[in-house]
Amino acid sequence: MAYQNFEDLEVWKKGRVLKNEIFETVKSFPSEEKFRLTDQLIRSSRSVTTQIAEGHGRRTFPDRIRFCIIARGSLSETLNHFLDAVD
């Protein structure tokens, strides 16, 4: 399947859904977490889609792969923050 924009990528679309769900979820967090866990969750989830978009804009395949790896790391960071929230 050919695509023109990063918005066409299924992985970016799923990352966007995750990011939006996180934005809704953190609204229920205690106010004392606003600048701690809430901020970390928002930043790491934004990084997932940001890295995918940036990688899409790179010209070389190794650069694209590198940004996918970074996005995966941001996704793992987001999962870790969710686990912290449960604890």
Show which residues each predicted segment covers.
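Amphipathic alpha-helical assembly/interaction segments
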Residues: 1-87
